Structure formats: C-alpha cells, structure tokens
Amino acid sequence: MSAEGYQYRALYDYKKEREEDIDLHLGDILTVNKGSLVALGFSDGQEAKPEEIGWLNGYNETTGERGDFPGTYVEYIGRKKISPPTPKPRPPRPLPVAPGPSKTEADSEQQASTLPDLAEQFAPPDVAPPLLIKLVEAIEKKGLECSTLYRTQSSSNPAELRQLLDCDTASLDLEMFDVHVLADAFKRYLLDLPNPVIPVAVSSELISLAPEVQSSEEYIQLLKKLIRSPSIPHQYWLTLQYLLKHFFKLSQTSSKNLLNARVLSELFSPLLFRFPAASSENTEHLIKIIEILISTEWNERQPAPALPPKPPKPTTVANNGMNNNMSLQDAEWYWGDISREEVNEKLRDTADGTFLVRDASTKMHGDYTLTLRKGGNNKLIKIFHRDGKYGFSDPLTFNSVVELINHYRNESLAQYNPKLDVKLLYPVSKYQQDQVVKEDNIEAVGKKLHEYNTQFQEKSREYDRLYEDYTRTSQEIQMKRTAIEAFNETIKIFEEQCQTQERYSKEYIEKFKREGNETEIQRIMHNYEKLKSRISEIVDSRRRLEEDLKKQAAEYREIDKRMNSIKPDLIQLRKTRDQYLMWLTQKGVRQKKLNEWLGNENTEDQYSLVEDDEDLPHHDEKTWNVGSSNRNKAENLLRGKRDGTFLVRESSKQGCYACSVVVDGEVKHCVINKTATGYGFAEPYNLYSSLKELVLHYQHTSLVQHNDSLNVTLAYPVYAQQRR
C-alpha cells in the first residue's frame, strides 16, 4: 500500500547533531510522509515551505537513512507516492541557521568528496573515468529494464558505497552486486566528485544569461559553449556526453523501466548541476536542458542497430595472399593506443576504403575500433572480443582481429551493414609515414626546426594574448551584468518613491492652494521634478551600459572565434616541429645543439658536467625499475623529491609500463607503450629497443615534446642516491 508524500532536495550539507538526525549532502533527495506533517498540525500547502515547518522526519533516498532533518536546509520539489512510515513525536527544537552557499561548497568538498577531480581520473582518448564506465556497463547489463532502477534505495549505507568506490578499478568485480547497490554507487560517485560534472561556474553563467535566452535549444548551445571553454578541462564535457548516452539508452526502454527523459532529468539534474542557489524557475530551466539533451541530442546521433553478419566465407593464406597467423602488433594497420583526433588527422582527405585499427577507448581488454573512410567521412566500428572470438556483432566468428580484417579486405562490409558497401582497401601503415623532413643534412634540418619552432612560439603567444583578452572580457561582462541588475533595483526604488510622492503631493498641493501658500507648492513641484530627473539619469546610464555590454559580448564571441581558428595551426606547427626534433634526435644530435636551434636560453650542455655516460646511475635498472608497484606507492616514493626524480613501473594496462616523474613539485604519470617497433611514449616515437635505452635517451631529452606540462628530463633515478 502506498501513501501520499512530499519530496525535498538538500541545498546544504548538514552533519547530524543528535541520534535521531540524519546527515544531508548537497543534492540529496528526501521524502516525507504527508501523515507525519498532518500529525504535527500542518495543513495542505505548508509542505511547500519547509523552512516554516521546522524539523521534518523523512527518508533520505540518496543515503538510505531515515530520521530528522532541518527544513531550512532543503527545498520543496513536489508530491510523491511512498510507503507510509510510522511518525514519531518529538519535542520542540530550534533550527540551525542555514549556511551561506560559499561555505557549503567548501564544507561539501572536505566532508563528502573522496574522489579526485574528473581531470585527474582519465584523459582522452578515454571517453569517461574508468570507474564510471564500469558502473554504467554493469547497470546497463543487469537493470536496463528494471522498473525501480534509480528510485529504490539499497540496504548499503554511504560508508559501504564509498568503500566500493575506493576499490582498485582494474580488479573491481561488480558481478556480485545487486543492481540497486550499483545504482546507489553511481549516484554516490556523482555526489562525491569534488566538482559537479557541469561546473558551478557554468551553472551560474547559464542562470545569469537566462533573460537573454529565448529557448531551451539556445540554453543547450550555451551549455556546450561554456563547458567547452579553455578554462574547463575537456574531461567534464566527455563525462557529460558519456552520461547522456547512458540516460538515452535508459529512456529507450522507458516502457519497462519507467525512466523517460523527464524523469531522468528530474533525478539527475541536481547531481549534474549541484547548484544550491537556483530559484524554482531556474531549476526548471536546468531540468529542461537535461531533458532535451537526453531526448533529442542522442536520439539524433544514435546509429541504427547493426545487422547480424552473414557467415564468413572460408579464407586461407593461399587464396588471399594474407597471413591470418600474423600477430596484431606486427600488422601495419594496427596503431595501438592513439586518440580519435590522431586517427582523423591520418585519414583526412583519403580515399574511400582507407582504414586503420586502434585500441577501443573504453579500454576493455580485447576490444578494438576500426576506423574506415566511406563517403568522405570516418566510420567508427567497434570490434568486440568474447570467449576468444572477434567480430562486429553477434555471433562473433573470427579467431583474431587479423583474420577479421583480412576477411573484409576481400569481402564488402555490406555483409555487416548494407550502408557500408566498401572493402578495406587501403591500410594506413604505421611503417610508411609521410616524410615530413625533406632536407638531407643535419644543419639544414636544424634551421628548419628553428623556423617551425619560432612560428609555433609566435602562434602560442598570440593564443595566450587572446586567452587573456577572453578571460578579461568575460569578467568585465559579468561585472556589467551585475551593475545592470543594481541599476534595475535602484530604478525600482526611485519609481516607488516617485509614486509615493506623487500620491501625497496632490493632497498637499490642494491644501496649500486653499491656503494660498504658493512657496510650498513650488517646493513640492521642484522636489518631484528633481526626483523624475534623477530617474531619467539612471535610466540613461543603464541604457549606455547595456549598449556597452552588447558590444563587449560581440567582442567576446569574436575572440572566441579567433582562438578556435588558431588552434588547428598550433597543433600542426607543434606536430611538424616535433617530427624535425625526432629526426635530429635519432641522428644523435646532442641536447646543447638542439637547445640552440630551439632558442632555449640555457644552451650550455648541462650533461657535460656529469661524468661519462657510462658512469650514469641510469645504467643500473634497479635504481629506477620498481616492477609491479601501483600508482599510490609510486607517488609515496617520489613525494618530496626534486624535479626530474623518476621511476618506471608496470602499468595497469596489460603489456605496457608507466613512468612516474616529479615535475614542479608534483608527481606526474605517463604510459610507456610496448609495440612491434619498440618502447616509447607515443607513435611514432616507439623506437627504443629496451626500457633502459628509453630512459638513457630521456635522461638528456625533455618530455615536453610529448606533453606541454612535462617540461622535465629523467634526471634522477628514485633509488640512485641510496645506492651511492
């Protein structure tokens, strides 16, 4: 039997003070039985004003706790059918003062957050944090059609959920967990992030721009622009995209799970935005944005399901001239762990039928992505792996990725999808890359390196100047909006004063006319005109400020446009510069000479002060190779060490290693790939025959060529000093 109840959302964190209380975290959803309010003497309508009720007794749907919580800490959402609890009487009790928003955010971060920031959890080409991917995949596998998904609380308490989230992702097995526990862990994950998926700065901007936006579609375009701002890490946008895909998938089976776009947006917009100061009107705007994103954005992009493949024709080495027994690492078209952006670059302006294979961005072991050129566009096709078999869709019939690719080099992919009537004709070979370096002697190549590096630095400075203008203009726009709001309030006060004076002036003017007191009449009229004149001045000032704001908003958009136009040039210049640098490095050019061409101020060969290369501690692998140590142990080993101190360990990614190095006082981590061509940090730099050879090279070559934030060499093995 169900009873009528009410739903509330927590606006602030609250730490329970008595045994009968429950904790509140920002965004928690709570339900209160109507009968419990009636028993306390409250009538219909008062439920919408929890701050006037005082203390409420209810159920926290997010944490699974039941008890008392302060009405000043929550906002009313609406009515809901619930299972009736037994209300318990309680003596009168004073309410705590609701904290200010700024304090709440800080407290929330300290008390609730146990997860690192999204920018620290993953990096492109990954599409989302590994832990989030695991949770979503497990939920979709177990509960896609569950009619109580995300609305029924499991028996797990917050501490147990946090313990689950703290587990090592690689070894985490979610098969044993009930779907409702997984759903609670999913919501707890979103709550425990130090910053919401849609940052507060974006939410604030969305709400402040509300008067200028005409439709929800404009809101969505504005959201995309704000969250893609250079000041916000790209991981936030990727995570939002991943979550929207999950919500869309749920909404596709809403006839069974009852989770349509509206319900999902009401459930998750508080967790995605986490914006406590929004009015009910603004909250509805934010809910509507998520609803439209779920129901339209992904509905348009979702591809039609793939047709089941026909049984493959038997192929042999004899009749197709291809070797199905070749290892994947040796295949010229297999590029390993490269990003989608790099793939797009390699396939740009190529003929239909051009293809390559890379590791799938989901990082599920054995899954890959085939990227194929068709109709002038890149088509991404997932290669699945299960029970030792590979294929594009069930049933998986190929024994290896090589066998699968070789099959479709002879047969059209129309067997798999009628719209893909093309064969895999032209592999993009990792062994035959375009020869960017045309010059044939070291001095000539060095001069070209200097030219490209100079162009790159000029473009970088131009981009930095634009970014400073972009930030300054954004701040000025915000200040002008605040000033306009202040003008509006001032005008409102003056107009009210003017109306009051006008009302009373009529009475006094009539009185003074009867008395023949012309002086007082003139004084009243003068004061009234003075007040009207002041209002007119303020209105003019506001109008001028609004005109300035429009001009500055146009300038802001123009700066944004110019920044976006410079980005491709920056990427291309850096890529070309790095290829020249790699060519010179392979020819054995010393860092001193490279510094001269790169225009670095400190061109002295710092390594000439060190003993001969043979005396370097790097030759002893025990000084830097720590074996199967994990990320946390690596950070503990390197904490407090000087810049350039490093170690190499086995990576959680099978067959690879990780380098951990101190940069600007912080420990950074980067993957070392192991490929058919050798070890390296990225294609086409995977050239070193051993880890030792790679370490010796980067002992005098900066890692900055692979990552702008890693301007450091592998100078000091972590155990070197202890062994001296």
Swiss-Prot record:
CDD domains: iSH2_PIK3R1 (cd12924), RhoGAP_p85 (cd04388), SH2_cSH2_p85_like (cd09930), SH2_nSH2_p85_like (cd09942), SH3_PI3K_p85alpha (cd11910). It holds the Pfam family PI3K_P85_iSH2. PROSITE patterns: RHOGAP (PS50238), SH2 (PS50001), SH3 (PS50002). Belongs to the PI3K p85 subunit family. The SH3 domain mediates the binding to CBLB. This is Phosphatidylinositol 3-kinase regulatory subunit alpha. Residues 3-79 form the SH3 domain. Residues 79-112 are annotated as: Disordered. The modification Phosphoserine is found at S154, S279, S608. Residues 84-99 have a biased composition (Pro residues). The modification Phosphotyrosine is found at Y467, Y580. Polyubiquitinated in T-cells by CBLB; which does not promote proteasomal degradation but impairs association with CD28 and CD3Z upon T-cell activation. Phosphorylated. Tyrosine phosphorylated in response to signaling by FGFR1, FGFR2, FGFR3 and FGFR4. Phosphorylated in response to KIT and KITLG/SCF. Phosphorylated on tyrosine residues by TEK/TIE2. Phosphorylated by FGR. Phosphorylated by CSF1R. Phosphorylated by ERBB4. Dephosphorylated by PTPRJ. Phosphorylated by PIK3CA at Ser-608; phosphorylation is stimulated by insulin and PDGF. The relevance of phosphorylation by PIK3CA is however unclear. The modification N-acetylserine is found at S2. It comes from Bos taurus. Residues 113-301 form the Rho-GAP domain. One of its GO terms (cellular component) is phosphatidylinositol 3-kinase complex. GO terms for molecular function: 1-phosphatidylinositol-3-kinase regulator activity; enzyme-substrate adaptor activity; ErbB-3 class receptor binding; identical protein binding; insulin receptor binding; insulin receptor substrate binding; insulin-like growth factor receptor binding; phosphatidylinositol 3-kinase activator activity. Heterodimer of a regulatory subunit PIK3R1 and a p110 catalytic subunit (PIK3CA, PIK3CB or PIK3CD). Interacts (via SH2 domains) with CCDC88A/GIV (tyrosine-phosphorylated form); the interaction enables recruitment of PIK3R1 to the EGFR receptor, enhancing PI3K activity and cell migration. Interacts with PIK3R2; the interaction is dissociated in an insulin-dependent manner. Interacts with XBP1; the interaction is direct and induces translocation of XBP1 into the nucleus in a ER stress- and/or insulin-dependent but PI3K-independent manner. Keywords: Acetylation, GTPase activation, Phosphoprotein, Protein transport, Repeat, SH2 domain, SH3 domain, Stress response, Transport, Ubl conjugation. The keyword Ubl conjugation applies. It comes from the Eukaryota. Residues 333-428, 624-718 form the SH2 domain. Binds to activated (phosphorylated) protein-Tyr kinases, through its SH2 domain, and acts as an adapter, mediating the association of the p110 catalytic unit to the plasma membrane. Necessary for the insulin-stimulated increase in glucose uptake and glycogen synthesis in insulin-sensitive tissues. Plays an important role in signaling in response to FGFR1, FGFR2, FGFR3, FGFR4, KITLG/SCF, KIT, PDGFRA and PDGFRB. Likewise, plays a role in ITGB2 signaling. GO terms for biological process: cellular response to insulin stimulus; insulin receptor signaling pathway; insulin-like growth factor receptor signaling pathway; intracellular glucose homeostasis; negative regulation of apoptotic process; phosphatidylinositol 3-kinase/protein kinase B signal transduction; phosphatidylinositol phosphate biosynthetic process; positive regulation of D-glucose import. The record marks R151 as: Arginine finger. Signal peptide: none annotated.
